[in-house]
Amino acid sequence: MTVPVNATNLRIPLDTGRDREFLDSWAELEAIGATPAGGVERQAGTAEDGQMRDWLSRWLRTRGFSVEVDPIGNLFGLLEFNPGAPYVLVGSHLDSQPRGGRFDGAYGVLAGAVAADRTRRYVTRSGFTPRYNVAVVDWFNEEGSRFKPSMMGSAVFTGTLDLEEALNTTDDDGVSVRDALAAINGIGDREVFSSTGPRQLAAYAEIHIEQGRELEKNNVTIGLVDRTWAANKYELNVVGIQGHTGATAIEDRQDALLGAALIVVALRDIADEFGEELHTSCGQLTVLPNSPVVVPREVHMHLDLRSDNDELLAAADAALRRRIAEAEIRAGVKVEHRKAHVWPGHHYQPQGVELARDAANDLGISSMLVQTRAGHDSTNMKEIVPSVMLFVPSVEGISHAEAEYTSDEDLCSGVDLLTEVVARMLDGSLDAAGAGHP
């Protein structure tokens, strides 16, 4: 079987064994860090993350890729077809949430690697030289569960996060990113790509599970991501006074956990008030001293607000700040705003969306426009190079959980489409698209 003729000269034959080859590799990859309930545990910089990276490095090297790592731990597999030409970069991330899903991120890395390798095989057989080279990437610490913020590797790569600040970031046990990467031999000594160096980028592509239900509800195989939601993420410290849960009178308590609980309830109230255009969450609470007979003196909490409407997001932010002030009075506590990370919502380049739509139509794969409410590394990358973001369906929309699932059929269809998208990008189909948002 051969993909239909497209607007480029690069056509990637799809042989009948292509799905089996991908699925066999996928079975090896998803077994690393596997949990009894069908998920995975491989947070950034852990031994399991190191095992994933080692597996990927071996897979790439045996297929002729050169493997390099940059100073923040992003791992690249490079294929040079046209010496001196820029690269099309494709990939995602290998790290996971605690007891997370096995498809989130890792699918996109392997799919990108397979797409690049299929291109290599075609170039070797045909003698055709693409306009650009191709590289695969595993972005370090996309999830942000062990080290904050999320999308750390791509943020450093795109210049929105300082390298030293990222390397000095510590987890809850005081281990720094620098030390965690060193422990898994995952830190490089020089940049792999640079806007002024010998290696530059032409475009970026990423495929990911949807982590929602739009594709499933519409019985569609591929989501063409045209916009990312904005996100405001906050770290708060709620500070009270430690006391005895039995002896301290209720009216005398300055209960940090009560203050935090009021803020959590406020988040849900705000979501209900603003409707489906706003998502609010509190995903992590650290309670001190966390004793059953002690009124908590301090709670560290992580919150986020997300929306595709900037005005609505600003209004929700103002509402949250009012409710925080009310919680301070009600609980007799002080709330310290430690840090905030803000990601604006922007459109992906329309030329990339159309390229992917045309490729899906040519392959006979159903597609539809979708937005991403979750952050992805392409959120950062689209600001510096033309970028394409694709989704495959998530059964029941479950993600960041061990029950996360995408069918083999949808996984393989996604790899086929990504292969064709990368082929068209390698032949310059996005040359007219600029970086940033329209």
Curated annotation (Swiss-Prot):
The record's remark on the cofactor is: Binds 2 Zn(2+) ions per subunit.
The answer on whether this UniProt entry bears the keyword Secreted reads no
Keyword set includes Hydrolase:
yes
Q: Which part of the chain holds the cross-link Isoglutamyl lysine isopeptide (Lys-Gln) (interchain with Q-Cter in protein Pup)?
A: 217
- Which PANTHER family did the record assign? ALLANTOATE AMIDOHYDROLASE, ALLANTOATE DEIMINASE-RELATED
Give the similarity note. Belongs to the peptidase M20 family.
**What's the protein name?**
Putative hydrolase MSMEG_3995/MSMEI_3903
- Source organism of the structure: Mycolicibacterium smegmatis (strain ATCC 700084 / mc(2)155) (Mycobacterium smegmatis)
Q: What is the taxonomic lineage of the source species?
A: Bacteria, Bacillati, Actinomycetota, Actinomycetes, Mycobacteriales
